[in-house]
């Protein structure tokens, strides 16, 4: 853990054109009687001060440290696309997850004129590793490409006859070749990286949960480089849960170690 503590915080002076949308976040400090109630039990016994965010902030920790839970709580508080709603018990009688989220607090950043931002950008989102795996699985499980394209056309408002006519057209054939090319890219192990490249757009806050999943070490470094560029030049902010040494060694980030009781940086 000592190596993690040696990472330096990148200051605003070294990162021109940066944007901080979420400046701080404080977890609920309410004590509940039952030590097993989720998500209170995840952070029980921790000395919790507000997390203070930089353009790139990393939650580092082993499995069970609470890094994914923390990201999801932030996503719920901010109502980000991709947030997951969890229940605390098998009966759902008491909404402990909702209560916990309501007891959290956060601060927003400032705009170029020094005024507090009123809203998180609407294109911000919470991207989980299972989201990526689901997209890959969709590509793998299309049994017949033309059937999949026909289904997509009908789903987008075409009649069945219009869909068939479109797929027989020159444009439809071109689209089919494009999708085949995309599937071939997956066979080379690049679809995961391509997914991130398509979804990570300028001027947004992104919460990434274990983005290293399904990426080779080389592609993890490429993704980390892209994140650095988006944060430095294109006014993106990232909060990332990871334990990948390749990403930790490449990201220009402030790192919180969630394996300690005091959440060291």
Located regions from the model:
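Switch/communication elements of ASCE P-loop NTPase nucleotide-binding domains
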Residues: 7, 41, 56-78, 193-265
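N-terminal pre-Walker A segment at the start of P-loop NTPase domains
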Residues: 16-48
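Short, flexible loop/turn elements at secondary-structure junctions
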Residues: 29, 55-57, 131
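ABC ATPase nucleotide-binding domain
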Residues: 50-52
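Catalytic phosphate/metal-binding cores of nucleic-acid and nucleotide-processing enzymes, i.e., regions
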Residues: 57-60, 85, 92-95, 170-174, ...
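Conserved ABC ATPase signature
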Residues: 126-129, 144-160, 165-222
């Amino acid at each position: 853990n000592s190596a993690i503590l040696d990472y330096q915080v990148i200051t605003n002076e070294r990162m021109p054109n940066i944007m901080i949308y979420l400046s701080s976040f404080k977890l609920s400090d309410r004590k509940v009687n039952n030590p097993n109630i989720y998500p209170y039990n995840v952070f029980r016994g921790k000395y919790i001060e507000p997390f203070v965010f930089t353009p790139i902030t990393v939650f580092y920790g082993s499995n069970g440290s609470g890094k994914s839970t923390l990201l999801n709580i932030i996503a719920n508080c901010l109502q980000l696309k991709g947030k997951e709603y969890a229940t605390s018990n098998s009966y759902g009688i008491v909404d402990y997850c909702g209560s916990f989220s309501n007891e959290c607090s956060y601060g927003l950043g400032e705009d170029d004129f020094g005024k507090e931002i009123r809203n998180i950008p609407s294109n911000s989102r919470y991207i989980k590793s299972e989201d990526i795996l689901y997209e890959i699985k969709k590509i793998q499980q299309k049994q017949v490409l033309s059937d999949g394209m026909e289904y997509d056309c009908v789903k987008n408002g075409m009649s069945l006859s219009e869909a068939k006519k479109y797929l027989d057209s020159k444009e439809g054939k071109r689209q089919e070749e494009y999708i085949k090319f995309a599937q071939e890219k997956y066979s080379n192990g690049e679809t995961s990286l391509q997914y991130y490249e398509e979804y990570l757009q300028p001027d947004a806050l992104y919460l990434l949960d274990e983005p290293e999943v399904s990426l080779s070490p080389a592609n993890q470094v490429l993704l980390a480089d892209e994140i650095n560029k988006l944060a430095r030049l294109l006014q993106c902010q990232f909060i990332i849960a990871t334990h990948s040494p390749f990403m930790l060694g490449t990201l220009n980030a402030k790192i919180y170690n969630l394996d300690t009781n005091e959440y060291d940086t």
